[in-house]
């Protein structure tokens, strides 16, 4: 099984597999500051039929959330992407001109970054094609393929969107962290609409109870908007914001629930579906705790609103998904190391006052990624540490039986020529 990815590849198994993998040309394409690489998924063929079925259903669930992230990253991202795709597929003019070639690169960058801003630096892309070319190209394609609002003309669509694409002063930064500026108003991300930073902070501060030892992650799964002068949340759930995509995700999760490996995993999937259907953040915490406790399933996954780096206020989470399965051979090696954690602690080159007398809550596994989606794709993370709530992490510390290493992705780094550079183990220990 070979899958296209941007930078990092899933971990492998025995030396024979690695040697075979090194014969593959991993480079797919290179443009702008990006290099697209493909990666292998060793070990998939060794899974049982039921396990493969589970991976398939979870993979389908992962594929349904793509447009959620595009919209989270910017209000006009989906409209711009669909305009570009309509021209890319339907333009009848000369596709070898510098303008069309530049538009093609721009579209690929939009695909890669899930929007019109750089996936890492968050600055807006500068198009290498002219507004005149793009207007003529948009007007030349079948209007039925364009993302026109009800009653909107092609010209009106261009007037609405062109400043976002071509004016460097409009939405220049997806996430602005400059001191002294209103971080909400100056960030192009789509987590707030019509509210200022102060209004957003006041809204959520009013919800928080300093005495609550198990607080929910306020704002994690919603857009904060001001409508008719009233500030309110639009929750991401079935029947709410992003409801259509989430309904499809739940559909595939329901199928996955039917082939779950263990009762614990079945409970995890059921609780995640409940969260998507209700949008209740207490339910999300219950899901996170169940997920942490499930250490025996070989197939594992993340699907949901997880990391908050895309929000300038660090509250609202982008959607992402990862489906993986345990690499048994590599995990055995890792467990040998983690099982001797106390020895490493005792012999670490730090002052004795900083050493722990007893290391607890150490476990580890090495995984192979079957698919990544949303904010994990195509620019991948090398690890996902969940849950984010500090109080849940503290529970794991107090109860060593529930202490786990939340290590989600082990990668082989690829060189531009496709050779395997290193085997990276990313571990987060609660100890």
Label the model's feature ranges.
Residues 20-83:
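N-terminal-proximal low-complexity accessory segments that begin disordered
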Residues 6-10:
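C-terminal motif of bacterial Sec signal peptides marking the signal peptidase cleavage site
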Residues 44-47, 54-55, 256-259, 428-431:
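Conserved catalytic-core segments centered on acid/base and nucleophilic motifs
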Residues 1-5:
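Sec-dependent N-terminal signal peptides
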């Amino acid at each position: 099984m070979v899958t296209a990815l941007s930078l990092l590849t899933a971990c492998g198994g025995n030396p024979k597999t690695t040697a075979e993998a090194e014969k593959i040309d991993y480079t797919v394409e290179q443009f702008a500051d990006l290099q697209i690489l493909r990666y292998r998924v060793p070990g998939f063929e060794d899974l049982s039929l039921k396990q493969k079925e589970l991976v398939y259903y979870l993979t389908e669930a992962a594929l349904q959330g793509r447009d959620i992230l595009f919209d989270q990253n910017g209000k006009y991202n989906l409209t711009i992407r669909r305009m570009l795709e309509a021209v890319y597929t339907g333009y009848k003019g000369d596709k070898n001109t510098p303008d069309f070639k530049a538009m093609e690169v721009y579209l690929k960058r939009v695909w890669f970054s899930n929007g019109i801003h750089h996936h890492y630096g968050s600055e807006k892309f500068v198009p290498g094609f002219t507004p005149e070319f793009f207007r003529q190209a948009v007007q030349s394609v079948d209007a039925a393929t364009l993302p026109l609002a009800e009653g909107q003309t092609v010209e009106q669509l261009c007037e609405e969107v062109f400043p976002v694409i071509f004016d460097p002063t409009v939405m220049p930064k997806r996430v602005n962290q400059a001191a002294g500026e209103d971080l909400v108003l100056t960030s192009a991300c789509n987590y707030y609409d019509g509210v200022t930073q102060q209004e957003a902070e006041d809204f959520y501060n009013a919800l928080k109870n300093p005495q609550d030892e198990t607080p929910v992650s306020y704002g994690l799964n919603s857009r904060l908007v001001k409508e008719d002068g009233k500030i309110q949340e639009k929750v991401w759930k079935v029947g709410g914001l992003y409801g259509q995509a989430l309904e499809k995700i739940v559909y595939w999760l329901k199928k996955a629930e039917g082939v779950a490996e263990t009762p614990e995993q079945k409970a995890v999937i059921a609780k995640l579906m409940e969260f998507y259907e209700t949008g209740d953040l207490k339910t999300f915490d219950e899901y996170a705790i169940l997920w942490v406790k499930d250490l025996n399933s070989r197939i594992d996954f993340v699907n949901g609103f997880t990391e908050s780096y895309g929000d300038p206020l660090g509250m609202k989470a982008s959607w992402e998904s990862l489906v993986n399965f345990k690499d048994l051979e590599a995990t055995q090696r890792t467990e040998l190391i983690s099982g001797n954690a106390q020895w490493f602690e005792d012999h670490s080159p730090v002052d004795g006052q900083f050493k722990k007398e007893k290391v607890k809550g150490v476990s580890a596994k090495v995984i192979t990624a079957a698919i990544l989606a949303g904010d994990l794709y195509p620019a991948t993370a090398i690890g996902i540490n969940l849950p984010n709530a500090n109080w849940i992490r503290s529970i794991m510390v107090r109860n060593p039986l529930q202490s786990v290493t939340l290590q989600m992705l082990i990668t082989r780094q690829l060189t531009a020529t496709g050779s395997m550079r290193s085997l990276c183990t990313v571990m987060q220990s609660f100890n």
